[in-house]
């Protein structure tokens, strides 16, 4: 009998020069301001990317023709400290409600005007060994640039 595949999580963090509540708000309500509109899985061109700010809310891409594509579902909503999403994208970067890797984002005040943002993307095993490893490698390369876009927008809009 084969041992279950264990796939290492992806961990990324950034210190944002912005107060805690603002840092959380930019990550969630301000998604269109920092997420690259050419970086999507649904119909193109993308007009906006948004997060429904509640438990059970969705991360959505909205195309210029109004087509909505769900990327993730929020399974934990604790503003301004934490949110967790089930990432519903397959290894071919297509929406797939059967995929269930998770993105856990924590926000911790680091003084009155700074926030430590820690992102954990894990549970790639739920995708199967080969697709899970492929997704893990892709997001390990992708999240650093995305988190940098986010940090720049949070700091710019906090000034």
Q: Where are the model-predicted features located?
A:
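A structural signal for short, well-ordered beta-strand segments
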Residues: 12-16, 119-121, 143
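Conserved strand-loop elements at the edges of beta-sheets that form or border functional pockets
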Residues: 16-18, 53, 76
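Hydrophobic ligand-binding cavity/cleft-lining segments
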Residues: 1-46
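Hydrophobic-ligand binding "helix-grip"
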Residues: 49-50, 64-114, 122
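A conserved amphipathic terminal alpha-helix motif
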Residues: 123-159
């Amino acid at each position: 009998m084969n041992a279950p595949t264990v796939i290492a999580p992806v961990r990324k963090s950034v210190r944002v020069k912005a107060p805690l509540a603002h840092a959380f708000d930019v990550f969630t309500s301000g998604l269109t301001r920092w997420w690259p509109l050419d970086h999507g899985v649904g119909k193109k061109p993308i007009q906006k990317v948004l997060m429904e700010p509640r438990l059970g809310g969705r991360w959505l891409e909205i195309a210029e023709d109004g087509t909505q594509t769900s990327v993730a579902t929020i399974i934990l909503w604790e503003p301004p400290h934490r949110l967790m999403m089930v990432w519903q994208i397959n290894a071919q970067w297509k929406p797939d409600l059967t995929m269930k890797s998770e993105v856990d984002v924590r926000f911790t005040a680091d003084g009155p005007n700074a926030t430590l943002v820690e992102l954990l993307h894990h549970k790639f095993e739920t995708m199967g060994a080969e697709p899970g490893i492929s997704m893990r490698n892709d997001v390990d390369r992708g999240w650093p640039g995305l988190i940098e876009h986010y940090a720049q927008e949070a700091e710019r809009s906090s000034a």
